[in-house]
Amino acid sequence: MQKFTVHKGLVAPMDRENVDTDAIIPKQFLKSIKRTGFGQNLFDEWRYLDAGFPGQDPQSRKPNPDFVLNQPRYAGASILLARKNFGCGSSREHAPWALDQYGFRAIIAPSYADIFFNNSFKNGLLPIVLPEAQVAQLFDETFAFPGYTLTIDLERQVVVKPDGGEFAFDVQAFRKYCLINGLDDIGLTLRHKDKIKAFEAERLAQKPWLAHTMIS
């Protein structure tokens, strides 16, 4: 998992409340047994005018020119600004996968659905919670100033605006540790591989029959 310490990026405003996971990555794209390739179908039903299906060549699609991510001023955005209850709806880890694979490193919103919020941290995506008034101010400034960027300093837990103003945010210490060190669940487990090997060796010494393969 990619480490997250300080990130400066272009902001894209998703000016809708209650954006659900089916909007983030529609259900027809969940059939893949792979964990990659979801970025091209992020917000598929809003992003394109034609119906999308798995395996489709994105170059053959008809982009919706009115959708925020298709507007030239937001090309290359890596910070998504959203309204309240982002990521609601059914549980699907594909939602943070799609956002991450599109190129987003962080989301800023007043609130999130719990499962989406937890899944984001586990996949290297930082979901920042700010008060609605601060989020509204960021929306106003993003709309007013083309090329609007923010700097997110996870170590200091602040969002830094272009004028130097800062908005502080909270993040659980363990989640912060994992993001700064680029550790997902597998990475955390591998940090204890020596202890795991020692435990397995001791267990097999005490119960050698566990190593035998039963043949039926």
Curated annotation (Swiss-Prot):
Broad EC category: lyase
Superkingdom, natural source: Bacteria
Single GO term (MF): 3-isopropylmalate dehydratase activity
GO cellular component: 3-isopropylmalate dehydratase complex
Pathway(s) this gene product operates in, as recorded in its UniProt entry: Amino-acid biosynthesis; L-leucine biosynthesis; L-leucine from 3-methyl-2-oxobutanoate: step 2/4
Substrates-to-products reaction catalysed: (2R,3S)-3-isopropylmalate = (2S)-2-isopropylmalate
NCBIfam families with a match to the protein in the record: leuD, PRK01641.1
Keyword Protein transport tagged: no
Protein's organism: Variovorax paradoxus (strain S110)
Pfam families registered for this protein in UniProt: Aconitase_C
SUPFAM superfamilies assigned: LeuD/IlvD-like (SSF52016)
Annotated protein name in UniProt: 3-isopropylmalate dehydratase small subunit
Family classification: Belongs to the LeuD family. LeuD type 1 subfamily.
Coiled-coil features, chain-numbered ranges: none
Protein purpose: Catalyzes the isomerization between 2-isopropylmalate and 3-isopropylmalate, via the formation of 2-isopropylmaleate.
Assembly, per entry: Heterodimer of LeuC and LeuD.
InterPro entries in the cross-refs: 3-IsopropMal_deHydase_ssu, Aconitase/3IPM_dehydase_swvl, AconitaseA/IPMdHydase_ssu_swvl, IPMI_Swivel, LeuD
Keywords of this entry: Amino-acid biosynthesis, Branched-chain amino acid biosynthesis, Leucine biosynthesis, Lyase
Enzyme Commission number, as recorded: 4.2.1.33
A biological-process GO annotation: L-leucine biosynthetic process
